[in-house]
Amino acid sequence: MFDKSEEYIMAKYRIAWLPGDGVGIDVMNAARIILDKIGLDAEYIHGDIGWEIWRNEANPLPDRTIKLLNETDCALFGAITSKPKQEAEAELVPKLQGKGYIYSSPIVRLRQEFNLRTNLRPCRAYPGNPLNYRDDIDIVVFRENTEDLYSGVEFHPVPDDVRRVLRASHKKMLRFDSTPNEDMAMSLRILTRQGCRNIIRDAFEYCQKYGYKSVTVVEKPNVIRETSGLMVRETRKIAKEYSGIELREANIDAMCMWLVKNPQTYSVLVTSNLFGDIVSDLCAQLVGGLGFACSGNIGDNYAVFEPTHGSAPKYAGMNKVNPIAMLLSVKMMLDWLNEGDKA
């Protein structure tokens, strides 16, 4: 994956170290204590990412950090601050303001740049945690990580040529004819067959490998018929290859209700990007909140592991934020590196 020439410290692993913003720095410090304690043979290389980099360079994920990731085995990531378009532009240093720079989430860009197509979110109740909703919850969420509304194909105002093509292609666009371009915003939900099949197969393979009994596809095909319909249809096809695993289907709204009512009856959930973002946070709260919510962004040749909480700037530097999500993310990284004994 990288040139192991003599210019590098000859550790077994080279790990990109991306603290980011706010409490991301704090929890990464906790992770380093654990990694040093277990004696992982690794070199940790700092990478610039996040809000301060955006403010000073108008790019929260600079090319030098992309280069770093291309030269390492995997990455650990802390947290980032993100703000809406206008606020982000206003916080640039003065010399960069008014030049048309647009903030985009660096973690979303990382997922797309390295095709980290699978977002894996284990949500397990650990014994003795008083914040557990129930003590018998063991849910794993598989969230497609690079498509859906997170593809970034958005318009505001909506250009005339986009409206013209859509109007000619779909009669339901006619009801918006009287709405001015500047009064309309549009985000495209894009799902590909291959993207669906990849995340679905990952979910079934995981279910089979670790002895889970069911996979539930979570979508909204009764309303979002084409995109959610594609995900559900592909799940049904792939499920036929795994005869010992029960396939369940649930609409996203009903799924949220059933997870609150009977979370212990579910094991592996598979869904698209936005719905996965929503349902995984719900599942996290069932087992103690985001302080226990680890995740892996996993592709064919690279992976980035991170807690799912935000940067919580008001707590930065105070070491008040629960580091367990970060430590569980470290465990996921060790498993991915086949360092099971250390995990």
Where do the protein language model's features map onto the residues?
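Glycine-rich phosphate/diphosphate-binding loop of Rossmann-like nucleotide-binding domains
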Residues: 15-38, 164-253
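Short, Lys/Arg-enriched N-terminal segments with co-localized hydrophobic residues
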Residues: 1-9
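Glycine-rich phosphate/nucleotide-binding loop
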Residues: 63, 101, 258-343
